[in-house]
Design a protein with these regions (language model features):
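A conserved beta-strand-loop-helix scaffold within acyl/acetyltransferase catalytic domains
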Residues: 64-117, 125-133, 179-192, 198-309
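Aromatic (often tryptophan-rich) hydrophobic motifs at membrane interfaces
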Residues: 109-114, 132, 143, 154-166, ...
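Acyl-donor-binding surface of acyltransferase catalytic domains
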Residues: 2, 6-12, 16-55, 139, ...
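Short loop/turn motifs at secondary-structure junctions
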Residues: 106, 171-173, 328
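Short catalytic-loop micro-motif centered on adjacent basic/acidic residues
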Residues: 176, 231, 331-335
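Conserved acyl-donor/pantetheine-binding loop and adjacent beta-alpha core of acyl/acetyltransferases
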Residues: 127-145
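Active-site/acyl-donor-binding loops of N-acyltransferases
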Residues: 16-19, 26, 34-61, 109, ...
């Protein structure tokens, strides 16, 4: 037993050493000039809360009230977000408090309001210190999509100009904008990611009949294997996090803090839930479901690989979809995937279809493609080392790293 303990300890230290060596090879540049990609043919917005200018494409003069919110958004913010065709969970006002309280990131929530009573534009973002890769202003960190959304194109351009100004004023090395539609920026977006959406019928029986025979058989297999599903909230957080932390280690990814999910469940309240799949009394799968507008989202889900043969994820998702039908939810968002990946195939088997995500990244590098390539190689090496660490180590140090990774 003593020899085995020495072997495990040595393996742990080797993995930690490998992780540290790669991380320390990247020293952040002390002084970065931020060369933000400009908007096409749109003048910059001055650095004060309100500015009067002529809106491009409008005959009459209008007053643009472009301001950054100093406190959490009110109900009007969510009303504007949900009324937009680009409505998404990432626009929810709740993230202002969740991300700030859990990780200490500074929120930059911008609104652009016309004087004619038209729809406003909203643009949420956070300043994230991403050691060792510099500081970024991201809309939205940890989520599939952010802003800007709502209003007219001139208003969206005004909000974008303000957020670019905020990033430049704070010495950000990079700005990330994750959107559901293209922006008026002189930089091409990454089109690698899609989010997968499924329209829901009004009752679970209709949904069941629409599912492929293979999917229904896998759900039945989970039931025959003794898998059961329970839905709750904060009372199930510990069980969810236990599974989630193991799965994130196995994937080579630092885990979010439990406080992040606690803040999420507390702030969203009754529209957020935890779904747990159990084999006997032991949790073997879990997911977080959040309803925003007419859509139910699953931003985080995990199962233990050792139990995947019992298909706990199938019964867990079926129960979540079934409840969404009973609650009168119009559509279900399975979250982002890379086309052709395993998670993409898992989601499409439920009848989900792709919706393109437009992810823009602007930075001061003279060779952004090379910089991204170097960044990707670094994360790949770190991921390999991370998988070798014991779960208790990844749970202890993972949240400190995860809060600085915006994806």
């Amino acid at each position: 037993m003593r020899e085995r303990h020495k072997s495990v300890t040595a393996s742990t230290f080797d993995a930690i050493r490998a992780f540290a060596q790669v991380a320390n090879s990247f020293v952040p540049t002390a002084q970065r000039c931020v060369s933000m990609v400009p908007l096409r043919d749109v003048p910059a917005v001055p650095d004060h809360p309100s500015t009067e200018r002529t809106c491009p494409g409008h005959d009459a003069r209008c007053v643009l009230d472009v301001r950054r919110l100093e406190s959490a958004p009110e109900a009007a913010w969510d009303a504007a977000a949900c009324a937009s065709p680009q409505a998404h969970l990432g626009m929810a006002s709740a993230w202002f408090a969740i991300i700030r309280n859990a990780y200490g990131h500074r929120p930059f929530y911008v609104t652009a309001q016309p004087n004619d009573g038209g729809d406003p534009v909203i643009l949420p973002a956070f300043l994230v210190h991403r050691w060792p890769f510099g500081t970024t202003l991201t809309s939205m960190p940890f989520l599939d999509a952010g802003g800007p959304t709502g209003g007219t194109r001139p208003l969206r351009d005004a909000a974008l100009a303000r957020i670019l100004l905020e990033a430049q004023a704070r010495g950000a090395a990079q700005i990330e904008l994750r959107c559901l539609s293209p922006l008026n920026l002189a930089v091409p977006p990454s089109l690698e990611k899609v989010t997968l959406i499924r329209s829901l019928p009004s009752d679970p029986d209709s949904l069941w009949r629409e599912l492929d025979t293979k999917v229904r058989n896998q759900i039945r297999k989970a039931e025959r294997s003794g898998i059961s599903v329970e839905t709750g909230r904060l009372d199930l957080l510990d069980e969810f996090y236990r599974v989630f932390a193991v799965n994130m280690r196995d994937l080579g990814s630092p885990v979010h803090s439990k406080e992040f999910f606690r803040q999420l469940l507390h702030t969203f309240g009754s529209v957020a839930s935890v779904v747990i799949a159990r084999k006997g009394a032991a949790p073997v799968g879990g997911l977080i479901a959040i309803t925003y507008g007419e859509t139910r989202y699953v931003p985080w889900a995990s199962t233990l690989r050792s139990h995947n043969a019992s298909c706990p994820n199938m019964l867990m998702y079926w129960e979540t979809l079934r409840r969404a039908c009973l609650d009168g939810i119009a559509q279900f968002d399975f979250g982002r995937s890379t086309r052709g990946s395993g998670t993409h195939r898992f989601k499409t088997q439920w009848g989900a279809t792709d919706r393109q995500l437009y992810w823009y990244t602007a930075n001061c590098s003279q060779d952004p493609a090379a910089r991204r390539s170097s960044h990707d190689r670094t994360l790949a090496v770190l991921s390999g080392a991370w998988k070798r660490l014991p779960v208790f180590v990844t749970r202890a140090i993972g949240p400190t790293i995860r809060k600085r990774l915006t994806q």
